[in-house]
Design a protein with these regions (language model features):
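Thiamine diphosphate
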Residues: 1-122
Length: 122
């Protein structure tokens, strides 16, 4: 079975009905599969914190939301996670790709990988 299809099948099986995504090379197959599913309302976001706001609205509107993003934006989203998602106790599954390890062609991704590990360790 195709892993992208399996991931999205599991989202549907768990009643995820709203997904927002930020472009991500590693998760492009999952994003394409989400886009092609009638069971999921998909809204691409310009930025990760914008996507979290969309997910908050979807949750308040009775949907089960999720966001798909890269780890390099984790730092940008901390304020939104703390002051909106966590403060109001909104469940928000997040599928996050991980960049910045060996052979990473984009140097700024490597720097953020170091910070990602530190943030997740807290």
């Amino acid at each position: 079975m195709n892993i992208d299809k399996k991931i999205v099948d599991d989202l549907v099986a768990n009643d995820i009905s709203f997904v927002t995504t930020v472009p991500c090379k590693q998760l492009a197959g999952v994003i394409e599969e989400v886009e092609n599913r009638d069971e999921i309302f998909h809204i691409p976001s310009n930025k990760e914190d914008e996507g979290m706001g969309l997910c908050a609205g979807a949750f308040m509107g009775g949907k089960r939301p999720m966001i798909i993003m890269q780890n390099t934006a984790l730092g940008v989203t901390l304020n939104t996670l703390a002051t909106l998602i966590q403060f109001y106790r909104m469940p928000l599954p997040m599928l996050i790709s991980y960049r910045g390890e060996l052979r990473e062609p984009v140097s700024c991704q490597v720097e953020m990988a170091v910070h990602t590990k530190a943030l997740l360790a807290q």
